[in-house]
């Protein structure tokens, strides 16, 4: 598998498929999971017909970077990203999954998304324009789109299998999973965001907002909260170049901006069939993902 050839899907013979998400193919290996990040890309909640070469490698290697750096804040589910350390049945798939896979512990996923926002953008900006609040949190009047908030806020959302996640208040989250658990998730979410945003700022990147997912892992008769899925990637976060930041509108970003711009330009109705992306949009999007990884980590993508 050449470095430039995108991986749209994986079919690992002899390995039980757990589920297939918009980007990741998941496999069961005894009591563990193998997460393989493909190069699929979605927009408006649909997987597009084109893939972005190396996107899955960026997501996996950036998540691995953050899992390694945030262990002092919260335990995570990562075991290894080195296929030579994986169970024997996976060895014959090494060339396909190298650099884009992660062996993880199975957890019981907590059924809310944990979003931290340091800047007013996206769905938060839309809600603020309506009622001056975001997920029930009152904000100062007169804020502009992309303004920095007085302090980061925790804005949970429900997990949607299809379609958009729905923003909810802390109280609503408490009714779903319990107030004590929500309180601890809020603490962890804001601690992770604060740590990540500070590191990113030192690398010239603003983390406007980001989404974390957590699971529960049985340990010594107790349920331990564990950080799962992906962490501070261009797919789960809004990354802005600090030297181009100008509040009062949308910002340039290290993500699928070129894809969204193209889809808007061709007036796609956001329903199937999904369009193919032209080569220049694919190339520029790939470059943005790799630039985000290399800026954030100071390392070349493996």
Where are these regions (language model features)?
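A long amphipathic alpha-helix within ATP-dependent nucleotide-binding catalytic cores
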Residues: 177-208
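Intrinsically disordered, low-complexity acidic/polar segments
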Residues: 44, 125-126, 219, 236-238
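Anionic ligand-binding catalytic core segments
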Residues: 130-181, 224, 231-296
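Conserved metal-phosphate-binding beta-hairpin within the catalytic cores
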Residues: 116, 207-230
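Short, well-ordered strand-loop elements centered on a beta-strand within folded domains, enriched
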Residues: 32-39, 126-128, 163, 221-231
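Short, active-site-adjacent segments that bind or coordinate small-molecule cofactors and metal centers
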Residues: 105-107, 202-210, 215, 286
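Active-site loop/lid in soluble adenylation, ligation, and acyl-transfer enzymes
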Residues: 2-157, 270-276, 280-302
């Amino acid at each position: 598998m050449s470095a430039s050839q995108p991986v749209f899907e994986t079919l690992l013979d002899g390995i039980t498929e757990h589920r297939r998400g918009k980007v990741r193919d998941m496999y069961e290996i005894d009591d563990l999971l193998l997460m393989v990040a493909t190069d699929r890309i979605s927009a408006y909640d649909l997987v597009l017909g084109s893939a972005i070469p190396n996107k899955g490698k960026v997501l996996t290697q950036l998540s691995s970077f953050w899992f390694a750096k945030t262990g002092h804040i919260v335990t995570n589910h990562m075991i290894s990203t080195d296929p030579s350390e994986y169970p024997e049945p996976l060895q014959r798939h090494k060339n396909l999954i190298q650099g884009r896979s992660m062996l993880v512990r199975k957890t019981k996923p907590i059924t809310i998304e944990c979003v931290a926002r340091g800047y007013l953008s996206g769905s938060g900006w839309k809600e603020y324009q309506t009622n001056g609040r975001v997920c029930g949190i009152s904000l100062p009047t007169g804020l502009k789109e992309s303004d920095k908030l007085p302090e980061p806020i925790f804005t949970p959302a429900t997990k949607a299998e299809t379609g958009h996640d729905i923003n909810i208040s802390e109280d609503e989250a408490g009714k779903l999973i319990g107030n004590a658990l929500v309180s601890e998730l809020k603490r962890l979410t804001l601690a992770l965001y604060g740590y990540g945003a500070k590191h990113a700022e030192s690398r010239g990147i603003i983390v406007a907002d980001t989404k974390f997912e957590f699971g529960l892992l049985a340990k010594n008769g107790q349920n331990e909260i564990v950080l799962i899925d992906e962490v501070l990637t261009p797919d789960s976060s809004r990354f802005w170049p600090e030297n181009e930041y100008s509040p009062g509108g949308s910002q340039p970003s290290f993500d699928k901006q070129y894809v969204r711009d193209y889809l808007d330009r061709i007036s796609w109705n956001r329903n199937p069939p999904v369009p193919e992306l032209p080569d220049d949009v694919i190339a520029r999007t790939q470059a943005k993902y790799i630039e985000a990884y290399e800026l954030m980590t100071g390392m070349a993508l493996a």
